[in-house]
Amino acid sequence: MAAFNTITALPDNAPGPWGDDVLISYDQRDVLLYAVGIGIRDLGFVYEEHPQFCVFPTFPIRWGGTGAPIDQKLVPPSPGPLDIDAERYLELVKPLPVGGEVKVRSRLIGGHPKGRGNGFVETESIVTDADGDTCIKMVNGSFRRGVEALGDIEAFTGAGQTYSAKIDVPERAPDVTCSAIIHDNQAHIYRLSGDYNPLHIDPEAARFGGFDEPILHGLCTFGHCAQLLLAALCDNDAKRFKKIRVRFSSPVFLNDKLVLRVWKDGPGRVLFEAAVGEKTVVSNAYFEYV
């Protein structure tokens, strides 16, 4: 059985040390491919000659956790099919340019047991631009369901901080409802942005991970939620995007219809959940905008 020792990894429940800056280069093609990969149709994000062409705010989400110094003897990694996105938080401080270089630094902030034989690991990341300005703040929560097989992690005591929190939606009809169809090649396109986990394309890997068929990337679901909210509440104006947080409650599959139910929660803030049929797939979620 694999063993986690987060008490040693995170003494006194303090965050771990920041890793070295990781230099990341990207270009216009990467920006366009990401937008198409999360199903965006608005030309301001998918056509480079559009007068308002810009980076969709959640573009850097895949950099979450990059370079975090994690002692694998204390917090062992899981193979792709057993390591899935559980929660994500992204805050836009300054828009990214449509191409160039940024630096990402990350650190481990928490590791806690999650059910029988599983671990929930959280990292914090900051993205800075060529001027040294902070552009993006992120927290990445991953659900490690084993190191060699499903549920093979020994019971352990959690340590560190957690951004995970329960957020209940109101018991009334939503103020806004919007939806999107997940096309049958959506995962094939999204993976070209750099997430090559076989869980999302290989039926055998999906079965190893406990699913009957490949599932949509959690970060693709995340992107769909963000683009639906920006369209419904901000007229697709990326400058109005502030922050978004989600928990992935259940997997989304190709050809599913993703429905967002949105409730106002004060000026510039909404609570939301996403469902496929009667199944809630995104919960404990909010979006803030100006």
Segments from the language model and where they lie:
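Hydrophobic, proline/glycine-rich low-complexity stretches
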Residues: 1-103
